[in-house]
From Swiss-Prot:
Allows the formation of correctly charged Gln-tRNA(Gln) through the transamidation of misacylated Glu-tRNA(Gln) in organisms which lack glutaminyl-tRNA synthetase. The reaction takes place in the presence of glutamine and ATP through an activated gamma-phospho-Glu-tRNA(Gln). The GatDE system is specific for glutamate and does not act on aspartate. Belongs to the asparaginase 1 family. GatD subfamily. Keywords: ATP-binding, Ligase, Nucleotide-binding, Protein biosynthesis. Residues 80-413 form the Asparaginase/glutaminase domain. The keyword Ligase applies. It comes from Halobacterium salinarum (strain ATCC 700922 / JCM 11081 / NRC-1) (Halobacterium halobium). This is Glutamyl-tRNA(Gln) amidotransferase subunit D. GO terms for molecular function: asparaginase activity; ATP binding; glutaminyl-tRNA synthase (glutamine-hydrolyzing) activity. Residues 1-18 have a biased composition (Basic and acidic residues). HAMAP family: GatD. Heterodimer of GatD and GatE. GO terms for biological process: amino acid metabolic process; regulation of translational fidelity; translation.
């Protein structure tokens, strides 16, 4: 029996039977049924029997009978233009019918169809830079991404939204923060939970990211849930953000500073307009139009990040011989076992730039307080202040390829990576 999206159906394959609403599928070879629980299930059409229980039980967005390409939002001269750049990740994911796992396979146009709430907020241009899960991110893709952002801004984009997997989003946001001088907002967003889950955060994050991209904050930032509720998203500076929870929707935090601002979802969900809705900005920020577009995307890939722990074998550091740079996550103020000092000194003598950060995250490195720290400074270690370890790695990759004096650059606040004063601890 023929069934259309929106029909309530019972699908039987083998000994299994599923009942729910048929929804549009990205493949003609598979059916997607939304169960009453809110989850989606994918079924191979080759061995499935379909019974229509209620025709047109619900209205399904995008069910026009036309090819998917016909769902593109029409251009409106009164609206800003936002470039949507997809790199993959959960926000652009669906069910892998081979395994039942979630796989990233939507391109930017699919995101528009999947999030109809984006319609009317802006004109959109979509492009795919990569289609990967973010654990497969590479520095070369950061360079491709920076080039794509530059091209979109040069073509007239009023803002850019980058769809990205959350696991390594902080690294990519840091990379573009160092690579780009941008006159418009560049907003990273993603989803902790895929679209087939009732608790998915993809729609709210995407809507808030587009509103942020229409705002006056011309920086690279991350837009994700600020709380577990669907109330507002936080805007985190790309060099001060860190994913601090594996699965919560509010997994991202600004560390050692306060967020650039917030996007109120209720306000953003009201009738779409050309102006940014629901965006409040807190503190100093680069304003739209202040900077002239420039890209410095060269990177030195031979940089390692090493976390010191008690009992760490000296061979782990010795294995970094030949690397252009090493960032160490030290304890407290920036310490390692005193037995490692000579190995670190040998790395420096051989031309490796060694940078010290703290695994404490809050506070800053100061190797002038204790003997161990002073010995590290004498060995040539560069203090990175309160730069986050992951950010320090990306910054060192960038500094070694672009700065006249990389060591000095690591002690300067490029793109807000290093604050001038750590926040006092408050309960």
């Amino acid at each position: 029996m023929t069934a259309d999206p929106g029909d309530r159906v019972r699908v039987t394959h083998g000994d299994a039977s599923h009942e729910g609403v048929l929804v549009p599928s990205p493949s003609d070879d598979h059916l997607v049924v939304k169960l009453d629980s809110g989850y989606n299930v994918g079924v191979d059409t080759a061995d499935a029997d379909i019974d229509v229980l209620d025709a047109d039980a619900v209205t399904v967005d995008g069910d026009t009978g036309e090819d998917a390409a016909g769902s593109t939002v029409e251009f409106d001269d009164d609206l800003p233009t936002i470039a949507l750049i997809s790199t993959g990740g959960t926000i652009a994911s669906t069910v892998d019918y081979r395994t039942g796992a979630v796989t990233a396979q939507f391109d930017a146009e699919d995101v528009l169809r999947a999030v109809p709430d984006l319609a009317g907020r802006a004109n959109y241009r979509g492009r795919v830079v990569a289609n990967i899960l973010s654990e497969n991110m590479e520095p070369s893709i950061w360079q491709d991404l920076a080039a794509a952002v530059r091209e979109e801004i040069e073509a007239g984009a009023d803002g850019v939204v980058v769809m990205h997997g959350t696991d390594t989003m902080q690294f990519s946001a840091s990379a573009l923060s160092f690579m780009l001088e941008t006159p418009v907002p560049v907003v990273f967003t993603g989803s902790q939970r895929s679209a087939d889950r009732p608790s998915s955060d993809n729609v709210m994050n995407a809507v808030c990211a587009v509103e942020a991209a229409k705002s006056d904050v011309a920086e690279v930032m991350v837009c994700m849930h600020a709380t577990e509720s669907d109330d507002r998203c936080a805007l985190h500076r790309g060099t001060r953000v860190r994913k601090t929870h594996t699965s919560r929707r509010d997994a991202f935090e600004t560390v050692g500073a306060t967020p650039l601002g917030y996007v109120d979802y209720d306000a953003a969900s009201e009738a779409a307009t050309a102006d940014a809705r629901g965006v409040t900005v807190e503190g100093a920020h680069a304003a739209r139009g202040d900077a002239t577009l420039d890209v410095a995307s060269a990177l030195e890939p031979a940089v390692e990040l090493v976390k010191f722990t008690p009992g760490m074998n000296e061979s782990l550091l010795a294995a970094c011989e030949g690397s252009a740079g090493v960032v160490i996550e030290g304890t407290g103020l920036g310490h390692v076992h005193s037995d490692l000092t000579d190995t670190i000194g040998s790395l420096v003598d051989d031309g490796t730039t060694v940078v010290m950060t703290s695994q404490c995250l809050e506070g800053r490195v100061c190797d002038r307080v204790y003997d161990t720290g002073r010995d590290l400074l004498a060995a040539g270690v560069v203090e990175a202040g309160d730069t986050l370890p992951g950010t320090a790695k990306v910054k060192l990759m960038w500094a070694l390829a672009n700065a006249d004096d990389p060591e000095a650059a690591m002690q300067e606040s490029v793109a807000g990576a290093l604050t001038t004063q750590s926040r006092p601890w408050t309960a």
